Amino acid sequence: MAAFPAYLALLSYLVPGALSHPEAKTLTSRASTEAYSPPYYPAPNGGWISEWASAYEKAHRVVSNMTLAEKVNLTSGTGIYMGPCAGQTGSVPRFGIPNLCLHDSPLGVRNSDHNTAFPAGITVGATFDKDLMYERGVGLGEEARGKGINVLLGPSVGPIGRKPRGGRNWEGFGADPSLQAFGGSLTIKGMQSTGAIASLKHLIGNEQEQHRMSSVITQGYSSNIDDRTLHELYLWPFAESVRAGAGSVMIAYNDVNRSACSQNSKLINGILKDELGFQGFVVTDWLAHIGGVSSALAGLDMSMPGDGAIPLLGTSYWSWELSRSVLNGSVPVERLNDMVTRIVATWYKMGQDKDYPLPNFSSNTEDETGPLYPGALFSPSGIVNQYVNVQGNHNVTARAIARDAITLLKNNENVLPLKRNDTLKIFGTDAGTNSDGINSCTDKGCNKGVLTMGWGSGTSRLPYLITPQEAIANISSNAEFHITDTFPLGVTAGPDDIAIVFINSDSGENYITVDGNPGDRTLAGLHAWHNGDNLVKAAAEKFSNVVVVVHTVGPILMEEWIDLDSVKAVLVAHLPGQEAGWSLTDILFGDYSPSGHLPYTIPHSESDYPESVGLIAQPFGQIQDDYTEGLYIDYRHFLKANITPRYPFGHGLSYTTFNFTEPNLSIIKALDTAYPAARPPKGSTPTYPTAKPDASEVAWPKNFNRIWRYLYPYLDNPEGAAANSSKTYPYPDGYTTEPKPAPRAGGAEGGNPALWDVTFSVQVKVTNTGSRDGRAVAQLYVELPSSLGLDTPSRQLRQFEKTKILAAGESEVLTLDVTRKDLSVWDVVVQDWKAPVNGEGVKIWVGESVADLRVGCVVGEGCSTL
């Protein structure tokens, strides 16, 4: 999330995190009453990884000469609505560092103009196409750079989709850690290739929208996650994305194991910065900052948007309060220096010191001129929107993603593709436009017309929208449209007529409630919105041939109509963005064969899921959200519980057929030890003088013109703050300035580099055995042996590759690599990744879904077709 309406922001409230629990060595599995996040201090310094050495050297030279005010300026936001972006830091003009602009969203520039509204993350995941994941990242980065955004707030790999009703699952790439990992890491590589900084989010456990934030009434919920589940499931995509070089990580609102993420020292210091070797800076989600000294010591580097518990009052936990904390000694100057060095090093690492644009847009108004600081009572005005067009040819990428994500679930009697002269009757408002205007609802906070994205801060304005109605009318010579959610009277149906029924299911962020759903799908559940099920059934009674097109944020129930004889075909078009119409007609009329695959499971009933993944209501006191299902979410649960879903994870049909033959398993690097080779030692980190700065460095400059509510680093009485340094600060239990031994699972960005040694490689020949062109996806799942002594899911997606467009009879050999980490479990005692020696007992499966396996391999025995 980033900025949201002021009246909702006022609900934010300071609640101290729980930091005084009995000592524990690991995050073992516990009941909620025992959930505990152990202390991990001090915060590790950045700069010890060679890939970042040059950037840190440049940062060190600059930070060494900064004043206290200049340092604090870069760590703190200037206040909500106090600039053009969702958030901005202060600046250091003396060294050419501007106010850094942090802005949404993961699918395009939010609240701007002349930008691309790309398909959502869940749509990208459904492509199973690594090239498109990267290309979208490049497009996002180019548009962020073009608008002068230093830090684009995305991608999102958390939530992962633990809760099917969760409001923001659609911002990520699917309900699997590996799919999320590829989506996140490739997006980051693409974005940062342009010089824009990616902010990976939300770390961690923000799997439900309701009750995530602390308020005047209660504390945000605690996601209670055991150590193994944390590493193997929720942390997995973060580790891969850190390995990709993420410049920033955004901390979530909620608690993890009863410690607020923004001041959870185990999570930030211990796991993210030490074990995963993260070299960039850690930033809060908007208004997730709930403590000053505690968060600094826990490893937080930047506060956004800078305000305190109640925004718009000009208060802050940092800004001048951080200046005070450094002067009185409660925050060590070493910690501040590392905070600033991480920020400046990231700025240098992405080359933003070289002709990077300043913001040329305003997220606060569409007018050309307006207040420069809208959150101030009195603000100077000027040009705030220059209407810079940053779209380039990104519409091509957007259309390709939306098209290649479309997932064909059912196609009885090959009713699809359609012919241009077929008699078509189209039903449902989801086929049309929002009659109030395509951008009439703030942050897409309504469900009117075709569903292009969910709602909330993860959205973008549509530069244009080609609806399915417009696209079909442009192609079909005989189409009749009924843009209504009630089946109309008097509709005639010929024996060969085809009805196309459009339905959808929406969700979003919890600061907006749409049709009774406060972010999460509380009221609608997993059912279609706007009478969708009844509309399909009514069409099925009238027509012999019905095609259902679904735009949805995630799993949707189909049981009321899926088995009706006249429902011949079902397409899931996910959330297609601006190219909703053209991408759909590309598939409907057969210009392309569908090649999308489900990035989640579609159940028969919500009761098919474990009870623990349901939405949780607000009791008196803090909600304890216990992850008692452990590793078993989505398809992993269905397999373990022996429940056959309506459609399995990875399912997707084509207009053609494919054969998988000639499988081969190669040993690339022997797994001759259970644990990876010893980690590389840490390199040196920048050092600075440890003396406290002079109090005069944060005195108000003479004749300074203050902007009301703008957050500054200056103190009215800095000498008084320094005089209080003799007082003893009540540090959290376990706080120390003595560095901890380097964790054995670390050693580089993402962890021990030996974890990414390719151990096995599977080659398989994919042949188009049908009569139409098409693309196939080979999905690789691993099954780990019981000899590891742990219960593991019977199938875990670890790799996938997609063929080029294959003509009828054409073949392509795909290579799918398997790493040491892919075959490892997290050892909570040793605190390292453990694999079966020599891969003994490992089974590898390749197929077109988790339930449609075409190749089976056993390490040491070879492969066979199934």
Swiss-Prot record:
Residue intervals passing through the bilayer: none
Coiled-coil positions: none
Record has Glycoprotein as a keyword: yes
Gene3D superfamilies reported for this sequence: Glycoside hydrolase family 3 C-terminal domain, Glycoside hydrolase, family 3, N-terminal domain, Immunoglobulins
Highest taxon listed in the record's lineage: Eukaryota
Entry keyword set: Carbohydrate metabolism, Cellulose degradation, Glycoprotein, Glycosidase, Hydrolase, Polysaccharide degradation, Secreted, Signal
Enzyme class per UniProt: hydrolase
Subcellular location: Secreted
Pathway where this protein functions: Glycan metabolism; cellulose degradation
UniProt EC number: 3.2.1.21
MF terms in GO: beta-glucosidase activity
Enzymatic reactions: Hydrolysis of terminal, non-reducing beta-D-glucosyl residues with release of beta-D-glucose
GO biological process: cellulose catabolic process
GO CC, alphabetical: extracellular region
Residues bearing attached sugar chains per UniProt: N65, N73, N257, N328, N360, N395, N421, N474, N659, N664, N724
One Pfam family recorded for the sequence: Glyco_hydro_3
Signal peptide: 1-20
Major location category of this protein: secreted
Ranges for region Disordered: 725-748
Family annotation (SMART domains): Fn3_like
InterPro entries associated with the record: Cellulose_deg_GH3, Fn3-like, Glyco_hydro_3_AS, Glyco_hydro_3_C, Glyco_hydro_3_C_sf, Glyco_hydro_3_N, Glyco_hydro_3_N_sf, Glycoside_hydrolase_SF
Similarity annotation: Belongs to the glycosyl hydrolase 3 family.
Function: Beta-glucosidases are one of a number of cellulolytic enzymes involved in the degradation of cellulosic biomass. Catalyzes the last step releasing glucose from the inhibitory cellobiose.
Protein name stated in the entry: Probable beta-glucosidase F
Gene of this entry: bglF
